[in-house]
Structures are given as structure tokens and as C-alpha cells.
Amino acid sequence: MSQMEIMLTLQQKLNDSTNGEGWENGLTKQGKKIDWRRCIYLEAAELVESYPWKHWKNIDAKVDRANIEVELVDIWHFVMSEVLRVNRLNDNLPIVELAIRLEDAIGKLDAQKIEDDYYAEIEAIEELIKKLFCHFELVDFTKSYFELCRKLGLSFERLYQLYIGKNILNIFRQDHGYKEGTYIKVWNGKEDNVVMQEILASKSGITPEELYKRLEEKYSEA
């Protein structure tokens, strides 16, 4: 299973669980309207806030590169959700075929060297927002999203790590008493998200199943 297929599969499961099966028709199980493009738009606006663009305050602030990664991953959740929705209502391809189609479209996914001109990065984000509302085409938009990731220094491998890390850690927490208040968040002096990042860094291309198992091993030692 490719990394793209893994992420699409995890997102489908997450949406089925949180929104209810049939969410592709535009409503949650509670009857709330879903608008993934609006989600993308608002997350993209938060991405812009990672830059010290304001001329009236915090003018000496630095670009928050760590938050840029976080926001790009959040946008990816919503891009995949829109991809899955449109696919279900139109082509209804199996996820494996959908993943191949996206991989063929986006090509090589290495990150570029980050430029000093962060205003150019902001403009690139705004160009992505424009595509949401002008001449929107799903595969082309997905390709543009990955072009933005490249410009902002986020590689596909790093995106994959961050995505499955967030997804699997949330599942792990729920499985181990997070809602009930019995979950232990600090493991031998380290927060669980730090342990998760260390596990991800120790093995390139780790699968969700491997990550969950390693988390269980570390948790049992806490």
C-alpha cells in the first residue's frame, strides 16, 4: 500500500467515524452541512498567520516554520476529504486507484529550499485560495497544494509522517482512556506527542500499524 493510499484510507475511516457513513452527500450524522472548501479556505488563512506580515504589530517577529507544517497538514485533511467526496459522487474509484491517479498527477514531491522572501510564500498561499473559488478542478487543485508544500519546505515524506502521527496518536489516546480521564499523557518525562515524533524519526515510511504498536510498547513502560 502506497503512502498516498494509506492516508486516503485513514481519512475515509476518520470521516466515516466522526461524520457518519454517507458524509459524502454533504451532511454529518447530526444533519450539519459539510463544506470542505470553506474548511480549506479558513485553514489557509491560519497558515498566512504563521508569517509576520502585519505592518502594525510584531514587526520583528520570525516566520513560524513549525506552525506552517501543522497548518499544511490540517489543510491536507480537508483536501483529502474533498477528494474522497467528489470521487464517491462521480467516478467512485476504489481508493487504491484514486491514490494512483493523484500520484501520477503530482509527480515528484521533494521540498524546495526555502527562500528568504516570505511575502512570495504568502502570495503562493493566496493563489491556492483563489483556485478554490475560480476554475476549481480537483486533481489540479491537489497538484497545486503539493506545489505549495514544496515552496514552503514540506516534503511528501514529512507530510506523511505528520499526518499519520496525528491520526494514530489520536486513535491511541481514545483507545487508552482519553475520554474517561485515565490516559497518561507524559511517559517517563516526555509528552506522548514527543515520543510519537521520536518513533517517526527512527524509521522512514513507518506504517500506521507499526506506529500504533510502538506507541503501545512505549506506553506500557510509562
Q: PLM features: residue spans?
A:
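Flexible "arm" and connector segments at domain edges
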Residues: M1-A222
